[in-house]
């Protein structure tokens, strides 16, 4: 074989390795940015900094959520919320409630104390 036209296998492997590392690093930075963005929201930070009351959260849940999710979160029109805190992070639950991105669930942004109470109640289901 002619050494001038045959690429050195070590150089090819090194180039591919560098490309893979660069892609993985870019993905890691993207995911880190997404994670930080979720926690940067002042509303989310305020809710997470507030101590919730599960009793008040139950009342808020029954008034606003119980019709679709069942009075005890066992699901009716909306999905069951039993063990929801094991399936979703606190931030994901807050964003699910306030976003309105899952029709037919309406957008709902209670004040931070009420959201902290609701979150505390959901953690008991």
List where the protein language model places each region:
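N-terminal Lys/Arg-rich, disordered targeting/topogenic segments
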Residues: 1-9
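N-terminal membrane topogenic signal
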Residues: 10-16
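Hydrophobic membrane-insertion alpha-helices, especially the h-region
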Residues: 16-32
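Hydrophobic alpha-helical segments
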Residues: 30, 54-55, 75
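Electrostatic cytochrome c docking/interface patches
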Residues: 34-60
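Sequence context surrounding c-type heme c attachment/ligation sites in exported
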Residues: 55-63, 86-91
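The canonical Cys-X-X-Cys-His
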Residues: 57, 61-71, 118-122
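Extracytoplasmic electron-transfer domains, predominantly the class I c-type cytochrome c fold
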Residues: 72, 76, 82-125
């Amino acid at each position: 074989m002619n050494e001038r036209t045959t690429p050195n296998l070590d150089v090819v492997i090194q180039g591919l390795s560098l490309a893979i590392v660069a892609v993985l690093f870019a993905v890691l930075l993207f995911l880190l940015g997404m994670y930080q963005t979720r926690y940067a929201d002042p509303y989310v930070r305020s809710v997470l900094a507030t101590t919730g009351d599960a009793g008040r959260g139950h009342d808020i849940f029954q008034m606003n959520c119980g019709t679709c999710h069942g009075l005890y979160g066992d699901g009716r029109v909306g999905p069951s919320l039993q063990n929801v805190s094991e399936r979703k992070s606190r931030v994901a639950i807050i964003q699910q409630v306030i976003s309105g991105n899952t029709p037919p669930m309406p957008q709902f942004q209670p004040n931070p104390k009420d959201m902290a109470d609701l979150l505390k109640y959901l953690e008991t289901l």
